[in-house]
Amino acid sequence: MRRLLDRFSLKGERAKPLEPGFYSYMAPPSHPFNYRLHLRVEPSGDGLMTVNASTVLHLNQTATECAYHFIRLTPPDQVAEQLSKRYRVSKGQAAEDYADFARKIQALIETPDLDPVTYLDFERTAPFTKQLSAPYRLDIALTYKLPTGSPRGATPHKRVAKELSTGQWKQVIEKAHAAGIPHIVFTGGEPTLRADLAELLMRAEDLGLVTGVITDGIKLADTRYLKTLLDAGLDHAMIVLQPSKAQTWDSLASFAYWREVLNDDIFIAAHLTMTKQNAKQINALIDRIAESGVRALSLSAADAALEPKLQAARDHAAMADLPLVWDLPVPYTALNPVSLELKAAKGRKQPDGAGKAWLYVEPDGDVLPGQGINKVLGNMLMDEWGKIWKSKG
């Protein structure tokens, strides 16, 4: 995610900040651009605004007020009047500054992959350096169960004695919303093995949250099942590819079908694990992924000895115009067993965003800084949010 610091600032006195809160806006179906905006007003009066859960803007107090009015669709003349009174500047100056802010946000909405720094005069802030009251994203492992036939030791099921119920997961989603977390990703194990996945997506949708699913894609090959997830509000998905299985490619075709039928620009990414068996075909697999309509690619290696070939594969993905996704958790599977994670973790530095930009919730509600980082910060169901967030250190 891009993380930016907005330089917008009215030249008047500093007014009393807005009350802390969390606000969202989703464009209506008739709008030509399918977009969502979220604004979290921090206790300091500064704010965090996300555009489609991908571009993150760190806003100063006055820019936060502009974002608040932009999301609430306040008429521009009323915005100018309020800003003029609060910051003791002329109404004309306030109107001009708000119009400039609105133009920049509209450009981010309407122009895919626009660099806000280069084109919109935003200032970039170093990732993960801002003090936040909550992360940008919550990764929820609904279950550590895997499809029949998967090796039992592939997931860390021994450390999780139970799974939360549907009602309990809804409480977790509601707590995330109350904390101001705009984005939830359901992972596992295999999240589609939970019969309540669509119901949980719908609860998040009702709260205005952006949702994603990371899955092996087997069940999504059934276009009717995928349609239930899309109807429930699914915004994006990452398919963990099993190249030797036809269902993997069928699931991508299923997304392409509904994207065309529904005229829905759902964002699809794919994860590909390089193994000794597929290393020689990796470029051909990447080409096939690119042709399927996938918008981004996540790559990993099952063996450290493959790292040089992995870098070459990343270069090939760039040539195929497939942006790389780095920070989404890859579900535990036969290709990504917990044993591989534990081996890779030895001597490895914790990802910079873990415990800051995102948190990871296990099937029993325990909160970790990130997948595979076995430091329990608390339990999302049992503990207060403030206690969990403070425990991250």
Stretches found by the model and what they are:
Residues D352-K356, N374:
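Short, small/polar residue-rich loop motifs at catalytic or cofactor-binding pockets
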Residues M1-Y68, T129-L132:
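Acidic, low-complexity/disordered tracts enriched in E/D and polar residues
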Residues Q131-Q168, A179, Q371:
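Canonical Radical SAM [4Fe-4S] cluster-binding loop centered on the CxxxCxxC motif
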Residues V338-D352:
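Short, basic/aromatic recognition patches
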Residues M1-S9, T55-I140, G167:
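Long, charge-rich, low-complexity alpha-helical segments
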Residues R137, T155, T166-T187, R194-L306:
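Radical SAM/AdoMet-radical enzyme domain recognition
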Residues L310-E341, D366-G393:
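C-terminal accessory region of radical SAM enzymes
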Residues V361-E362:
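Short, acidic, Ser/Thr-enriched surface-loop or helix-capping motifs
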